[in-house]
Amino acid sequence: MRYVTCNNRKYRWPDKPVVVICLDGSEPGYPLSDGGGYIDRAIENGQMPYLASIKNRGLFRTADATIPSFTNPNNISIVTGTPPVVHGISGNFFYDLGSDAEVMMNDPAFLRVGTIFKAFQDQGARIAIITAKDKLRRMLGHELDFEQGSAICFSAEKCQLTTRGEHGIDDASQLTDLPTPDVYSGALSEYVFSAGLTLLDTWSPDILYLSTSDYIQHKHGPGTPTADAFYGMIDHHLLEMQAHDAVIAVTADHGMKAKHDSAGQPNIVYLKPLINELLPSDRFRIILPITDPYVVHHGALGGFATIYLADPADVQPVCHKLSAQKGIELVLEASIACERFSLPPDRVGHIVVTSSTEWVLGHSQQYHDLSTLSEPLRSHGGLSEQRVPFILNYPAPLLVASTTLRNYDIFDAALNHTTD
């Protein structure tokens, strides 16, 4: 048996194509789920017959995502098989102490370990990666050699701009008959699946990784017509992939919850005015790690925040103040949060805050443009969005009763645990 080692985990060499899918924002069905979960409701409504069939012959359960339950840390956990304390990506956005600047965490320079893709390419595997948003692309494709013709990595967002030297393929928009998708649409994810299926047909990757957008999930709850149609599209493509005798593994980077009141107004805890009751603004810095270029999705409002203080002596008073606030679930000193959530201590600040299920955390009213929110707010980032799907189209007997699964166990499950 041939194995590849990456970050102290051994992975069996695939004997058939392995397709791992991160369905961004795919809230699963479980007792505390929002609306019964996207996949589960779509199955109930007859929109996902292929995944319905997997319930009886594969693995169909849930797992825990990494906290914060955001896109970047969880995608990188999935593709490295490690938590953030190992790979270093603590959010979509952070305060870089070295440069004294607030920056997007999109640069591969922030990565502290290699990816499963790189480890397999080094041993001769063919790797294909398609992500919806370009913000992830460089990190997912970090250190891959595109010149040798055994790796492809591009985003649906910028598919028409790809080159062989940078992405392993020229003009990836030609892979399908679909028009170049709008980044603020479900079509962005449909393109990911369609192009992935084309690569399975024509390029024969050993490992195919698909990472979608959560635009639909931010706008539409489980079981709604738009959500069901979106998941029906996914089911159709999964069935086509099954025809290639592929191992298909599905998980998510985070769930998604409604964050608004009965009138549709967002439930927001603004942190700055609360802390200003104790400290002047130049004595603290609030970081909202959900922040990314796609504010139409969420308005930079999520369930997780970190706070940097000029004087560590202020930690306890600030923690006490925030802990008493409605809408806040946890307020932790950084050392405790890093141990509990396996976060890199140098990228977290002094205090970590998570919101309650129906609430989000904001900076101040002036900081957020709520006019970008065309529907009642749905978002993620906290503990209430940690549960995600964990689905395999082949049996995995050893995982059926496993008490603890993480979304970053999905490559281990697909490569090491599936049986015919």
Q: How would you label these PLM feature ranges?
A:
Residues 289-419:
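Active-site neighborhoods of enzymes that stabilize oxyanions during catalysis
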Residues 55, 121, 242-243:
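Anion (oxyanion) recognition and catalysis
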Residues 31-81, 128:
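Short, structured active-site-proximal loop/turn typified by the sulfatase FGly-forming signature C/S-X-P-X-R
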Residues 20, 28, 50, 229-273, ...:
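Metal-dependent active-site segment of extracytoplasmic phospho-/sulfohydrolases and closely related
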Residues 28-30, 71, 87, 135-141, ...:
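Short catalytic/ligand-binding loop motif for oxyanion handling, primarily in non-cytosolic enzymes
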Residues 1-15, 243:
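A short acidic-Thr-Gly-centered motif at the start of a beta-strand
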Residues 239, 256-306:
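Acidic/histidine-rich catalytic neighborhood
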